[in-house]
Amino acid sequence: MGFKCGIIGLPNVGKSTLFNVLTKGNSAVANFPFCTIKPNIGIVSVPDNRINNLSKIILPKKITNAFIEFVDIAGLVKGASKGEGLGNQFLSNIRDTHAIAHVVRCFKDDNVSHIYNQLQPKIDVDIINSELILADFETCEKSILKLQKKLNFNKKEIEEKLVVLSKCLDHLKKFLMLKTLELDENEKKIISYLRFLTLKPTMYIANINEQKESCFFLNELEKMAKKEGSSVIPINSNLELDLIKMNEDEQKYFMKSFNITNLGLNNIIKSGYKILNLITFFTAGIKEVRAWAIPNGSTSLQAADKIHSDFRRGFIRAQIINYLDFIKYKSETKVKEAGKYRSEGKFYQIQDGDIINFLFNV
């Protein structure tokens, strides 16, 4: 199963352009609403210098980065929760993702129309978030009614669900997103089957240009995002789309000329990885050095299953080397001599950067 981050926003804010930057692809881009009808899905490599450093020592035949999926979902509009603009279909597409990248237009351009003929990023964000809240309210209300009819069966379990859902409904009635409601891990687990939209981790993507107004709009967006504990990643999508079409030398020259030290593209991918709460472990050998993405808190048995179900079924133990130890000692033999080579069982909690060799028998 891939880890999916859904790209959402109003029509004409630059979602498909951003998707093309992320995937270096050719998703349809046009100056009219609902250019994207069916969601485009792109597999995006996660930049990680550690895999390059390991490869310089091991010299493998193949290098494979960890990846996450970005899903380009069509623009939402007012009334989406009631079916406006094919809203039900698009809200369903968001429900299928694990996290949200909310693209907000923070630039003026007379050649690109705004669906409501006014550029106010805060209002744009409120429109989208309001639709997500309304959709969650409807989901919550329907679920409560269904559960109340089943109270004679599994009474204890149903009452437990009703307590949490009533808490959620009261919060949504105040037009507040569920991510701002204090829920413990058990409560989140109880309602996880409903896949609430406003409970999904979110990052805001500020689509900017070189104009002064972009700085003002960006500051406003950052203030708003801070209140809900979300991050804001600025990117000039059109500029970076031009950059990825250049060869490496041209790209370096252009970035140096315009004093660009870091691409927004990489920041978005890394932030997506972070809000999905993923960590990386490595498998390393002459054939391949590979990075694997797993949820933080995963056990060695779950990591084994990520590679192949046979690894999980026949699991014996996991041989672990810390990434920094391998970089320091340069080989497995020297790591062992230094006493830094470990053998762990199936309940060991994987740490970010672990290099793992799984022993199994089927």
Curated annotation (Swiss-Prot):
Binding-site list for ATP: N12, V13, G14, K15, S16, T17
Cofactor(s) this protein cannot do without: Mg(2+)
Role this protein plays: ATPase that binds to both the 70S ribosome and the 50S ribosomal subunit in a nucleotide-independent manner.
Gene name as annotated: ychF
GO MF term (any one): ATP hydrolysis activity
GO cellular component: cytoplasm
Organism domain of life: Bacteria
Protein's organism: Buchnera aphidicola subsp. Schizaphis graminum (strain Sg)
Pfam family, one: YchF-GTPase_C
UniProt: Mg(2+) binding residues: S16, T36
Assigned keywords, A-Z: ATP-binding, Magnesium, Metal-binding, Nucleotide-binding
Name of the protein this chain belongs to: Ribosome-binding ATPase YchF
